[in-house]
């Protein structure tokens, strides 16, 4: 009986320990919910930079308290939430190995968060400057998801719940890619989100501008705005927002008022076309960096380096070969005159200048002396991709249109991997399996609109992590309560039996 009573006391202690853990986690969740509230507040462009700084100050204080709870929560001088309370045994019976195992991961700001990955974006690409009044073909979309315009893709997602394949059809935009991942999220535990960002900047003169803008609607909307000063684009922002009901594209001024950030929150392509101005020489830049951040997208520049070096071996292909070069032949880079011009050495030792005015927008140069093949295509007339896979040496064009593809973000509160089912993996520069990385809630920065938006999924992951722990210890609590009741019942009945035996012995 005394052993049963000891086991019962152990069980009661374990219930008190679990109650301590749950109470601490409840406070941690309240902190995370407040952080999420602040992130939502900061994500609105009704806030100034100063407002967001003050909001970030509170985020920092909440993060510090989250860490304090993790390090200070203890029971009987034993730390519970710092990651050291693992695989602990609670003796809940009178015999050997009649134990209950309990373990809790750390719940500090460096451990809580979300596992995430994003589709690959370009650091630089071509056709940033669109000359007003010029007529040209539409510029290509600037994203690693470009390939999906022509090629279907399969992604094998291995998540916490199971493994399943996301099937993306040819012609998909970021919205379609995210939908394919969300269709299997019940099996994988991985959620997808698509968003398209662009930026309007570098307007060189006050003028009356007109262009078409297309997002979620199949029909483009016309935007007309007269800009009185290039240092304040309020008129253009208002004109874009006046058609946001049709496009789903919202515009917000940058801090200096001289630029506009465009966002399509559903992941539809942002298509800008037919750009004109009353003064035909006036130029405006459209790029996909909105605002600078690791997941913001590409910055389109019209003078990026070609990325080739002396000694590189390239295969030249063209429908209209430059004089001195033969299509489908191999050449060595003899010299690099500038970031946009180089000299190719022919098999007979002759040097042919290529690039700048000597290039052709239909040319392709394929670098063949490294694992990462570099390819020049007519879709990029000047520019360098961030993964070093594509360079262009042709002359810059005056295209007046472009399509900007969105970015897809995958997120889960558990680790996961994505593997390409075919030759392309748009979540990596290669075809290898990609492992999601943990975005820590301690690194949340809401001092910008984009940072606040990105913080939401990280905080949601942290909330899911703590919810899962509370669910597990809730189940453990229910089990231990049943154990305690059973031990009490056994103890009472054994005591009753012993009393009967003692009474019988006394009577005899």
PLM region spans:
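Primary detection of the long, small/polar-rich alpha-helical "axial" segments characteristic
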Residues: 1-290, 296-299, 311, 348-349, ...
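Histidine-centered active-site/metal-ligand motif
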Residues: 306, 363-366
């Amino acid at each position: 009986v005394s052993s049963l009573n000891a086991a019962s006391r152990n069980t009661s202690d374990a219930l008190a320990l679990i109650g301590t853990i749950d109470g601490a986690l409840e406070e941690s969740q309240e902190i995370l919910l407040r952080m999420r509230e602040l992130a939502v507040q900061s994500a609105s462009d009704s806030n100034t930079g100063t407002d967001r700084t003050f909001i970030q100050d509170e985020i920092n204080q909440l993060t510090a308290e989250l860490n304090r709870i993790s390090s200070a929560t203890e029971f009987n001088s034993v730390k519970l939430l710092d990651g050291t309370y693992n695989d602990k045994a609670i003796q809940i019976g009178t015999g050997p190995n009649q134990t209950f195992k309990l373990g809790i991961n750390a719940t500090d700001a460096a451990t809580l968060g979300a596992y995430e990955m994003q589709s690959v974006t370009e650091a630089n690409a071509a056709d940033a400057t669109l000359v007003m009044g010029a007529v040209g073909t539409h510029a290509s979309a600037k994203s690693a998801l470009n390939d999906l315009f022509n090629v279907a893709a399969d992604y094998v997602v291995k998540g916490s719940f199971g493994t399943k394949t996301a099937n993306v059809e040819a012609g998909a935009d970021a919205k379609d890619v995210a939908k394919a991942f969300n269709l299997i999220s019940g099996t994988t535990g991985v959620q997808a989100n698509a968003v398209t960002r662009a930026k309007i900047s570098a307007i060189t003169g006050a003028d009356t501008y007109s262009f078409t803008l297309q997002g979620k609607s199949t029909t483009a909307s016309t935007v007309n705005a007269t800009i009185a000063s290039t240092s304040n684009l309020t008129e253009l922002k208002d004109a874009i927002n006046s058609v946001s009901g049709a496009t789903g594209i919202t515009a917000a001024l940058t801090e200096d008022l001289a630029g506009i950030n465009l966002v399509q929150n559903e992941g539809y392509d942002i298509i800008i076309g037919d750009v004109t101005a009353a003064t035909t020489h006036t130029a405006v830049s459209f790029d996909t960096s909105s605002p600078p951040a690791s997941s913001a997208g590409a910055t389109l520049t019209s003078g990026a380096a070609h990325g080739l070096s002396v000694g590189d071996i390239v295969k030249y292909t063209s429908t209209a070969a430059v004089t001195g070069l033969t299509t489908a032949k191999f050449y060595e880079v003899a010299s690099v005159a500038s970031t946009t011009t180089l000299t190719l050495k022919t098999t007979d030792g002759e040097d042919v200048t290529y690039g700048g005015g000597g290039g052709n927008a239909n040319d392709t140069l394929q670098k063949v002396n490294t694992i990462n093949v570099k390819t020049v295509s007519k879709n990029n007339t000047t520019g360098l991709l961030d993964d070093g896979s594509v360079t262009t040496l042709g002359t810059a064009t005056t295209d007046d249109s472009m399509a900007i593809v969105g970015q897809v973000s995958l997120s889960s509160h558990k680790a996961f991997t994505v593997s390409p089912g075919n030759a392309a993996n748009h979540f990596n520069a290669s075809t290898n399996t990609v492992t999601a990385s943990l975005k820590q809630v301690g690194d949340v920065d809401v001092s910008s609109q984009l940072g606040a938006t990105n913080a939401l999924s990280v905080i949601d992951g942290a909330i899911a992590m703590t919810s899962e722990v509370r669910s597990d210890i809730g189940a453990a609590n229910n089990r231990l309560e049943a154990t305690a009741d059973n031990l009490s019942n056994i103890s009472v009945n054994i005591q009753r039996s012993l009393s009967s035996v003692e009474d019988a012995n006394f009577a005899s």
